[in-house]
């Protein structure tokens, strides 16, 4: 009889191991509520305590890497909600739970509801970015849905008055805490949409516990915000408080004051922007005028450089240089001829060739005469060419035309007026006379017949 059952015999170690595996695999992770007792924290930083109710108790451990995420200090007798894994301590055969997270019992139940509703609405797409409405910029009227006696309303109105005193504000007073609050918030959102007075809504309240903020975790409020045709800015609690309303709203503000900052324009900043734009415009105008003045000066200098008198002066200078060069050349030729004559005379005096001397002298005289006549002819030609050039320049000079009573008119950008279609009534034009300029306004334009 004993031999047939030997395959079912467990050692104590194997039994405890098998039970541990069954507990861990079958039970998995569970939520347990109970009262804390025998709480200890050794130097290792781990927590050891007993979780009990009226009729039973279980040993619990919460290791340091998990308990450092707990936001409160557990106390003896405190009711808590623990998320834990069930296991068995094999050396003693004691089963225990290993806690992963811990919350006060009341908040823990609310947190469970919060997570369940969040998952549900997220699955339905209420949090999707594609459904978010664009906030008006700027807003012309702001609706505020909150308690009329709360600090949140005071903060919102204070910021709006400071930033944009002229911005209209409509208050839709509601309860923000208690059983009636979700229904009132929903009705206020629906009323604001029905009246259509505002182009943006701030829905929120001041900070508080999870229970205090629970109205903004209500499914009815979330669906009313999602259905609102008016963009909604949520402003619930402090920056660390995140509600279901924050996920559904078109934009979440960390605080009520921040919501007021978001929906309003800063008039002082707007004034500074206008002043900055005026300064930039003034600088642009100054630069344009300076550039046009510089351009006018350049054109004026070019016209001066092309003045007939300057051209005549340059021609006279060139002619004088030519005359000097010709004089120097003549003197050099005469000097060379004289020197040659002297050398020849010296040789002839030594050889006494009188006939050759007479011929050479005659030849020299002829050369001197021809050279002199050639120089005189060249000088006469140059004087004649110079006179013709002067006559031609005076004939084509704009000043000569102006001296005969004609004028030249130009537009403000320096273009010479040739046809009446270049101007229209009201334009300013500049007229050049012989002795100066006139600036005039075109009163009318009449085509020629």
Swiss-Prot record:
It catalyses: Exonucleolytic cleavage in either 5'- to 3'- or 3'- to 5'-direction to yield nucleoside 5'-phosphates. It comes from the Bacteria. Its EC number is 3.1.11.6. GO terms for cellular component: cytoplasm; exodeoxyribonuclease VII complex. InterPro entries: Exonuc_VII_L, Exonuc_VII_lsu_C, OB-fold_nuc-bd_dom. Keywords: Cytoplasm, Exonuclease, Hydrolase, Nuclease. One of its GO terms (molecular function) is nucleic acid binding. It holds the Pfam family Exonuc_VII_L. One of its GO terms (biological process) is DNA catabolic process. It is found in: Cytoplasm. Bidirectionally degrades single-stranded DNA into large acid-insoluble oligonucleotides, which are then degraded further into small acid-soluble oligonucleotides. Heterooligomer composed of large and small subunits. NCBIfam families: xseA. Belongs to the XseA family. PANTHER family: EXODEOXYRIBONUCLEASE 7 LARGE SUBUNIT. This is Exodeoxyribonuclease 7 large subunit. It comes from Salmonella schwarzengrund (strain CVM19633).
């Amino acid at each position: 009889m004993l031999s047939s059952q030997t395959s079912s015999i467990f050692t104590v170690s194997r039994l405890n191991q098998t039970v541990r595996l069954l507990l861990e695999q079958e039970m998995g992770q569970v939520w347990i509520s109970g009262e804390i007792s025998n709480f200890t924290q050794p130097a290792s930083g781990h927590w050891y305590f007993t979780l009990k109710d009226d009729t039973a108790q279980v040993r619990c451990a919460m290791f340091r890497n998990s308990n450092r995420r707990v936001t409160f200090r557990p106390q003896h007798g405190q009711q808590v909600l623990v998320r834990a894994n069930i296991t068995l301590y094999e050396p003693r055969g004691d089963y225990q739970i290993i806690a992963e997270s811990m919350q006060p019992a009341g908040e823990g139940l609310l947190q469970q509801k919060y997570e369940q509703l969040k998952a549900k609405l997220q699955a339905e797409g209420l949090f999707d970015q594609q459904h978010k409405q664009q906030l008006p910029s700027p807003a012309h009227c702001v609706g505020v849905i909150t308690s009329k006696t709360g600090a949140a309303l005071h903060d919102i109105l204070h910021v709006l008055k400071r930033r944009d005193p002229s911005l209209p504000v409509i208050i839709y007073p509601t309860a923000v805490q208690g059983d009636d609050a979700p229904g009132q918030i929903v009705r206020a959102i629906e009323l604001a949409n029905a009246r259509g007075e505002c182009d943006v809504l701030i829905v929120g309240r001041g900070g508080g516990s999870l229970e205090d903020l629970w109205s903004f975790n209500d499914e009815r409020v979330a669906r009313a915000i999602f259905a609102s045709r008016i963009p909604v800015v949520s402003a619930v609690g402090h920056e660390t408080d995140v509600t279901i309303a924050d996920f559904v709203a078109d934009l979440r503000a960390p605080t009520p004051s921040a919501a007021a900052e978001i929906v309003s324009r800063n008039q002082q900043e707007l004034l500074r922007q206008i002043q900055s734009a005026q300064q930039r415009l003034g600088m642009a105008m100054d630069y344009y005028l300076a550039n046009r003045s510089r351009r006018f000066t350049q054109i004026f200098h070019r016209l001066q450089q092309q003045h007939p008198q300057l051209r005549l002066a340059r021609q006279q200078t060139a002619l004088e240089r030519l005359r000097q060069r010709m004089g120097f050349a003549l003197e050099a030729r005469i000097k060379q001829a004289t020197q040659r004559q002297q050398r020849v005379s010296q040789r002839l005096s030594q050889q006494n060739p009188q006939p050759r001397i007479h011929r050479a002298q005659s030849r020299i005289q002829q050369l001197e005469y021809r050279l002199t006549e050639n120089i005189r002819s060249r000088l006469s030609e140059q004087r004649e060419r110079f006179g013709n050039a002067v006559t031609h320049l005076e004939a084509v000079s704009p000043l000569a035309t102006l001296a005969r009573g004609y004028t030249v008119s130009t537009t403000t950008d320096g273009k010479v007026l040739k046809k009446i279609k270049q101007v229209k009534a009201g334009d300013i034009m500049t007229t050049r006379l012989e002795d100066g300029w006139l600036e005039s306004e075109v009163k009318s334009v009449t085509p020629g017949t």
